[in-house]
Amino acid sequence: MTARVEIYTRDYCGYCTRAKALLSSKGVPFTEYDASMDPDKRREMIQRSRGGATYPQIFINGRPVGGSDEIHDLDREGRLDPLLAEAAAGRKVRTT
């Protein structure tokens, strides 16, 4: 079982590229939603992230974890890998 990771992106977004590169470097599969030209996807992103309107917005097992800076902070603090492992094991993801 793997964690379900979703990322909302837009075209020409350096932060999006950076977040996807981090996930890819860890071998984490993710579903990408390009919301740049899709107003419905953008509304969905904002609603799911509880108001997050910047790109990217990242979700692990449906829980919002923030954007590129937040996911890199989690990695730098040594909290990203355990978070992904918990999600893969089916345990509740705690992002705070």
Tell where the protein language model's regions lie, with residue ranges:
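Structural micro-motif
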Residues: 50-59, 69
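Residues that form or flank phosphate/diphosphate-binding pockets in enzymes
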Residues: 17, 40, 66
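Conserved short-loop catalytic and cofactor-binding motifs
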Residues: 11, 33, 46, 68
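Local sequence-structure signature of Cys/Sec-based thiol-disulfide redox active-site neighborhoods
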Residues: 1-31
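Charge-patterned, long linear interaction tracts outside catalytic cores
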Residues: 90-96
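Non-catalytic interaction surface on structured domains
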Residues: 26-27, 47, 73
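Thioredoxin-like thiol-disulfide oxidoreductase module
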Residues: 35-53, 79-90
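Non-catalytic, surface beta->alpha helical segment in thiol-disulfide oxidoreductase systems
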Residues: 60-88
